[in-house]
């Protein structure tokens, strides 16, 4: 199963009479206004790019294996540290207990720095969620693909050591949120006047 598969392709606005994507104009505007809420539309160029990225992933030695025999877009809900939590994970692969997140990026060259700055917290949160539900610690992998040809792909495995500090941060934030909620005190990040 592909991360993009038929679900993404079904978002393209296609004229049922011609089988071709709609062009802009009065009829298209009427059709858009009558479409169900939550339907997203993409251009023909975007559809082609998605197909090319999908092809790259399916033909990548490791990404194709990681993103097969699992379940995409899984929503988990549970209480952690007295806080009701929800997360939507890109891909769960029960065999081997793999939690796989998929990202697009402009450049893989800067992606490892981005992981360290912004991504470990989210992955630690996801891993805590799934461990709370299954009772097992899952492996975390990231599959990143560049947004432009040749659609370079990189895969990173996050080690237990890389997630220790982020997990402690998640726990601290959940406990702080619960304290604020229970006391009905919401100071924000900068409650005092700051001087520079």
Residue ranges and their predicted role:
Residues 38-42, 109-118, 159:
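Short histidine-centered catalytic/ligand-binding loop motif
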Residues 62-68, 93-99, 130-138:
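Secondary-structure boundary elements
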Residues 115-117, 125-196:
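Metal-dependent nuclease catalytic regions and adjoining charged, substrate-binding loops involved
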Residues 122:
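Glycine- and acidic-residue-rich phosphate-binding/metal-coordinating active-site segment common to enzymes
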């Amino acid at each position: 199963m592909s991360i993009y598969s038929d679900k993404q392709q079904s978002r393209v606005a296609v004229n049922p009479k011609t089988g071709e994507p709609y062009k802009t104009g009065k009829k298209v505007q009427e059709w858009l206004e009558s479409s169900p809420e939550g339907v997203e539309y993409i251009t023909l160029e975007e559809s082609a790019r998605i197909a090319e990225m999908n092809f790259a992933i399916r033909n990548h030695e490791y990404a194709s294996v990681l993103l097969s025999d699992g379940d995409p877009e899984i929503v988990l809900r549970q209480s952690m540290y007295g806080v009701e939590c929800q997360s939507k994970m890109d891909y769960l692969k029960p065999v081997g207990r793999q939690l796989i997140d998929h990202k697009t990026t402009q450049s893989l060259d800067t992606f490892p720095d981005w992981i360290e700055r912004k991504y470990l917290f989210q992955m630690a949160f996801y891993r805590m969620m799934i461990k709370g539900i299954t009772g097992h610690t899952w492996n975390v992998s990231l599959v990143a693909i560049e947004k432009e040809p040749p659609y370079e792909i990189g895969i990173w495995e996050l080690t237990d050591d890389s997630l220790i500090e982020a997990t402690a941060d998640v726990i601290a934030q959940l406990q702080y949120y619960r304290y604020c909620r229970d006391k009905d005190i919401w100071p924000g990040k900068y409650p005092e006047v700051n001087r520079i």
